[in-house]
């Protein structure tokens, strides 16, 4: 009977399966090739993904929005930017009339682009050698808002610095510092960062210092 079947589990499994298919293709074994998505978010999360990964929880099909565009015929193809002995890899969702585009799902529209989205877009513009980009946010009701951005050299230099830092930490197998953000509460590695098992003490996010963060100042666009 229908009532005896666990549809929530079936739906969750379906979303997770589709999510794996639509995720960025990252070679986790090659520390000489770094994906832009790894260094425009918390480095510790990317570090754990590489060396001791856990599957993230995907709960909404809307979270898969960007990957769906990339899989279409007119979706953007992955590209690389050479950094001497390193390769910075990235993939926009679409490129239309030389304009780089990425799509993100949100529940509430931001007043400005989220820092990690702006950093990722900027990296993509340098990787594809394009000047202009658009970040499009779409909510659960299908409404959208967008931000036009122009590539920025200083911001890209910060991304390159993070690439080199991440590559060095991977080689040394040295865990990066915590970079607190609103995403921590839903991160699959939350307990590794904010729970000290030996002392059975839980750290409060609000008491963690933000002084070590290295993301550049994000300006309105």
Give, region by region, the residue ranges found by the protein language model.
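Nucleic-acid nuclease catalytic cores
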Residues: 81-171, 191
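Metal-dependent nuclease catalytic cores that hydrolyze phosphodiester bonds in DNA/RNA
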Residues: 1-100, 105-115, 122
């Amino acid at each position: 009977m229908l009532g005896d079947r666990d549809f929530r589990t079936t739906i969750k499994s379906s979303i997770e399966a589709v999510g794996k298919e639509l995720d960025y293709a990252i070679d986790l074994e090659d520390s000489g090739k770094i994906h832009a998505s790894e260094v425009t978010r918390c480095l510790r999360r990317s570090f754990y993904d590489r060396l001791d990964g856990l599957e993230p929880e995907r709960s909404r099909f809307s979270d898969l929005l960007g990957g769906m565009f990339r899989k279409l015929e007119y979706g953007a193809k992955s590209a690389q930017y050479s950094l001497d002995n390193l390769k910075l890899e990235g993939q926009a969702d679409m490129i239309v009339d030389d304009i780089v585009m990425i799509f993100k799902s949100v529940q509430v529209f931001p007043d400005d682009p989220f820092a990690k989205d702006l950093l990722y877009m900027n990296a993509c513009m340098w990787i594809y050698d394009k000047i202009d980009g658009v970040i499009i946010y779409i909510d659960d009701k299908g409404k959208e808002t967008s931000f036009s951005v122009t590539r920025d050299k200083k911001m890209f230099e910060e991304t390159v610095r993070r690439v080199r830092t991440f590559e060095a930490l991977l080689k040394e197998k040295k865990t990066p510092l915590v970079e607190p953000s609103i995403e921590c509460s839903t991160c699959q590695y939350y307990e590794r960062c904010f729970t000290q098992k030996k002392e059975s003490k839980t750290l409060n996010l609000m008491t963690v210092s933000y002084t070590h963060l290295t993301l550049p100042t994000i300006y309105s666009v």
